């Protein structure tokens, strides 16, 4: 992580979700903290109830931290919050040294994918010599043309020599594999529809896109982490989860 708030957010998040220290909600989280997670009602009080309910079972292991201005993204694994461990992304916004807002996209832990990759393995260190804004521009352009516009050949144009390392549980490595997967779902009427990007977190060669869309007509949140090498896409991780309509959520902040 190369930004200002990465360690602050990681420390607070780890205290809460790995050590079960709910006192951190009073010291590191703003009194007006806004919680967008579809799993939580009641902002700070809702998080307190969730963690206290998990008791000694609560745990968190971090794999990656991305810091980008007032946003920090964490990629990791939770225990104790559900019947199975959860893997995915947390995005925090920081203001005046406090955590003021949070979004997440979490999915059950899965077995290694057809290429043997897991939801968390792979490179973790941010290369601060890479221009984060250039990385953001590349990924945003790719995302818009390829996923929102559904021109899946974009995977060929934004990669090199067909190399694309895949951590999504259902897809093997390679450009052909990801295009085939997306085209097959589309042909079955279960295609992944991307409507808009709500936010990006860019740190060196890593870029997280947090977007909204639908799968087979059902509203979903997409959190997808892209890795670039020499300006081309080389690797990705994701957490794609069904989310309720804002009017049906446990809170009135909206999911996004």
What is each PLM-predicted segment?
Residues 1-256:
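C-terminal and inter-domain tail/linker signature
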